[in-house]
């Protein structure tokens, strides 16, 4: 997939880049797999902001993605490759032999006309096939990985993402995640073979603030530009430093302080992220 540039008829477009849509084959989405999801805008049920710098972004419909891959033993033909406004990778429309249609995340090297399947075991190691992790050979590159059997894929779902199966230990398998973290996952969980497609997304330059607004991201104001009542870094005459250790708006030290709470799943993490 090629990166395209734009003529610099404005200053913001000079450094703006995008992805070509040559790989997209569908002219329209399947209506039965589209659903409206109201935007939360970062507010809770009381209307208060609980997650800052969020907005609705461009108007879009949600595509129902099959993250569970539990349709065992029925082959599916890739009917189309589509754009999904809700994620940074492409999605593939599968047409199953029994007539049902489903969307999945498109892995690299999965093209229109390919036939894939999902099963507990016994499938070829090729992009798009899904099996229980305990039945996948050690060393295989996988994505769309479940953390709990039957819950649906939660790991390695974004563009260019993948994990590697490093070994087995009793009822668990050992995975190296995209962050570099090594952790155990139950062997009964499902995973899909291959690397998530559209890996060139990481090289895109948005170029202007407006493209961030389309994605639902609002501007972020520096604490030092606020008043003392609004932020611990606020106030002072002229351009003044924080005068203390940099903190969040609520006084929590930032720039490196670990804030992750202890969880029951800590015992499954063998080593934390790279350089963390």
UniProtKB/Swiss-Prot annotation:
How is this protein annotated for GO cellular component? large ribosomal subunit
Q: Where is the composition biased (Basic residues)?
A: 257-276
Q: Which residues cross the membrane?
A: none
Intrachain S-S bonds: none
**Pfam families xrefs:** Ribosomal_L2, Ribosomal_L2_C
Q: Which InterPro entries match?
A: NA-bd_OB-fold (IPR012340), Rib_uL2_dom2 (IPR014722), Ribosomal_uL2 (IPR002171), Ribosomal_uL2_bac/org-type (IPR005880), Ribosomal_uL2_C (IPR022669), Ribosomal_uL2_CS (IPR022671), Ribosomal_uL2_dom3 (IPR014726), Ribosomal_uL2_RNA-bd_dom (IPR022666)
- Tell me one GO molecular function of this protein: transferase activity
Q: Name one GO biological process term.
A: cytoplasmic translation
* Disordered, as annotated region: 219-276
- Keywords in UniProt for this one? Ribonucleoprotein, Ribosomal protein, RNA-binding, rRNA-binding
Binding partners and assembly: Part of the 50S ribosomal subunit. Forms a bridge to the 30S subunit in the 70S ribosome.
Which family does the similarity line name? Belongs to the universal ribosomal protein uL2 family.
Its biological purpose: One of the primary rRNA binding proteins. Required for association of the 30S and 50S subunits to form the 70S ribosome, for tRNA binding and peptide bond formation. It has been suggested to have peptidyltransferase activity; this is somewhat controversial. Makes several contacts with the 16S rRNA in the 70S ribosome.
Q: Which PANTHER family does the record cross-reference, listed alphabetically?
A: LARGE RIBOSOMAL SUBUNIT PROTEIN UL2M, RIBOSOMAL PROTEIN L2
Protein name (record):
Large ribosomal subunit protein uL2
């Amino acid at each position: 997939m090629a990166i395209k540039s734009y003529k610099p008829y404005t200053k913001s477009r000079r450094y703006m880049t995008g992805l070509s849509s040559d790989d997209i084959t569908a002219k329209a989405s399947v209506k039965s797999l589209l659903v409206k999801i109201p935007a939360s805008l970062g507010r809770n049920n009381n209307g208060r902001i609980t997650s800052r710098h969020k907005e609705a972004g461009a108007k879009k419909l949600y595509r129902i993605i099959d993250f569970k891959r539990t349709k065992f033993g029925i082959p599916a033909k890739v009917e189309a490759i589509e754009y999904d406004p809700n994620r940074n990778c492409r999605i593939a429309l599968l047409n199953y032999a029994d007539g049902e249609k489903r969307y999945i995340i498109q892995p690299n090297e999965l093209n229109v006309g390919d036939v894939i399947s999902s099963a507990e075991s016994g499938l070829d190691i090729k992009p798009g096939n899904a099996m229980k992790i305990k039945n996948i050979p050690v060393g295989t590159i996988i994505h769309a990985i479940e953390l709990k059997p039957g819950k649906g894929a939660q790991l390695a779902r974004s563009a260019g993402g993948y994990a590697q199966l490093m070994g087995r230990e009793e009822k668990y398998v050992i995975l190296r995640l995209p962050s570099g973290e090594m952790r155990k996952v139950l062997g009964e969980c499902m995973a899909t073979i291959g690397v998530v497609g559209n890996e060139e997304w990481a090289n895109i330059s948005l170029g202007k603030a407006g493209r961030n607004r389309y994605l639902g991201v609002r501007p972020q104001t520096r604490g030092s530009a606020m008043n003392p009542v609004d932020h611990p870094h606020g106030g002072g005459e002229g351009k003044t430093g924080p005068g203390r250790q940099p903190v969040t708006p609520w006084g929590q030290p930032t720039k490196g302080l670990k804030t992750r709470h202890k969880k029951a799943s800590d015992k499954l993490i063998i080593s934390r992220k790279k350089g963390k």
